[in-house]
Amino acid sequence: MPDRSEVFDIVDATDCVVGEASRSLVHDQNLLHRAVHVFIQTRSGYWILQRRSAKKDLEPMLWTSSCSGHVDKGEGYLESAIRECKEELGLELVRSEIEEVFRCSQCSETGNEFVRVYQARALGKVTPCPEEIIETIELRLDEMEVELAREPQRYASSFRHLFPFLKKKLSLT
């Protein structure tokens, strides 16, 4: 179960920090805050998705990006992305190994989170944390699109919202 006493920065409509609040207060009062999503590509070119643990307080057991999480109080987006890769997948990344793909303003689909989406390559062994992740799967981008269209209810709302932007950005590279 997530620690409801975690503290996050509260931000305004322009993503500037204006205060801080506990996780429970942020979610109970729908306050604007920050999050990251990281999409990890394997050496063979597949993208890793994770199925969220049943212990998650929001959207348990749904498929989402390789790893994701809130930006903690005083933490930057990039630092948060690197931390989440370590905590959820056991991947130790350095700044030069992770790249920002796009930014998403807060909306209901992201749970009032300003989101930065990153990509990285899994150069080491992926070891999912059982407290965070039930299972992982490796798919090509086109396979993700087919699966998402076929059974959207199996995917977290933030993933459903972010995927079209991700697909567009990655198709341009």
What would you call each of these model-derived segments?
Residues A35-C67:
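A glycine-rich, hydrophobic loop/mini-helix early in the fold
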Residues I48-L49, S66-E99:
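The catalytic Nudix box helix
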